[in-house]
Amino acid sequence: MTVLIHVLGSDIPHHNHTVLRFFNDTLAATSEHAREFMVAGEDNGFTESCPALSLRFYGSKKALAQAVIAKAKANRRQRFFFHGQFNTSLWLALLSGGIKPAQFYWHIWGADLYEVSHGLKFRLFYPLRRIAQGRVGCVFATRGDLSYFARQHPDVRGELLYFPTRMDPSLNAMAKERQRAGKLTILVGNSGDRSNQHIAALRAVYQQFGDTVNVVVPMGYPANNQAYIDEVRQAGLALFSDENLQILSEKMEFDAYLALLRQCDLGYFIFARQQGIGTLCLLIQADIPCVLNRDNPFWQDMAEQHLPVLFTTDDLNEQVVREAQRQLASVDKSGITFFSPNYLQPWHNALRIAAGEAE
């Protein structure tokens, strides 16, 4: 029997760390198909912190892709589980036959499914990637992303799977300890990545609420982002008074980020695709409603779990936000499919499907 190999095809430290830690702590002990990884990027202490895993690191996305393709060609029974993706060479290999459909299992993280970049090289590449994605053996994704994908590729198998957000189920009831009143605090975006469209989001918040709310913008990740942070700060100060705008430019530890989220009353996310599910989960856990773009299909997952959804096109005010908070507080968080530990069983199923041990 050939052991399944997991591939982290792009150097995205935060997401890769979350996946590796999840596999090391939760899956590796019970499945031999949860231990082998090929990772784009440097070790950064992963080998030491994840002793249950066998990790190979590659200095570039291209080097990793070449190694994956070589393994795929050497043994056509070898199967790969691609997490996220973001690696052009791997899509082209699937397109050209270097990797066969029966070898390619893909967990969609959102960004690599959607066609939102306007650069020429992206516009030229998207049609090729779209064809390649139709050759995937099986995709794993959120309900909304599965629906989006199926419209383009109805013949490709799709299975429900959620990114393993780091969550403590014991915190499900903590939100009720806080009395929510007074000036609203609104979280804008889930990171400093430009995909959050921070400036457009700040303008949208201002249009809805004016300079009457506290606005918090976490931008400590990714690194080397100061020019964009300054751009966002300048745009924000043109709308909000200094005491109402908090731009966080330093990377935060998880517990500090969790504490920050729990001081908020509303999350505001205008990106037109599924992303930031970790932040959304932590906000929902704390009874903090989220404003989504109608083109972000994750609203389907929230509606399926009977969670209130606010949209950027809604007329928002404090009364609407407080009512959404009340509705969230009435939801039994222990039953939400995309919360820990409920997302665990689909991961066990996904491993068996990708390894060829389940129909």
Swiss-Prot record:
Pathway: Bacterial outer membrane biogenesis; enterobacterial common antigen biosynthesis. It is an enzyme of class 2 (transferase). It catalyses: beta-D-ManNAcA-(1->4)-alpha-D-GlcNAc-di-trans,octa-cis-undecaprenyl diphosphate + dTDP-4-acetamido-4,6-dideoxy-alpha-D-galactose = alpha-D-FucNAc4-(1->4)-beta-D-ManNAcA-(1->4)-D-GlcNAc-undecaprenyl diphosphate + dTDP + H(+). The keyword Cell inner membrane applies. It is found in: Cell inner membrane. It is a peripheral membrane protein. Keywords: Cell inner membrane, Cell membrane, Glycosyltransferase, Membrane, Transferase. Its EC number is 2.4.1.325. One of its GO terms (molecular function) is 4-acetamido-4,6-dideoxy-D-galactose transferase activity. InterPro entries: WecF. GO terms for cellular component: plasma membrane. One of its GO terms (biological process) is fucosylation. Catalyzes the synthesis of Und-PP-GlcNAc-ManNAcA-Fuc4NAc (Lipid III), the third lipid-linked intermediate involved in ECA synthesis. Belongs to the glycosyltransferase 56 family. This is TDP-N-acetylfucosamine:lipid II N-acetylfucosaminyltransferase. It comes from Salmonella heidelberg (strain SL476). The gene is wecF.
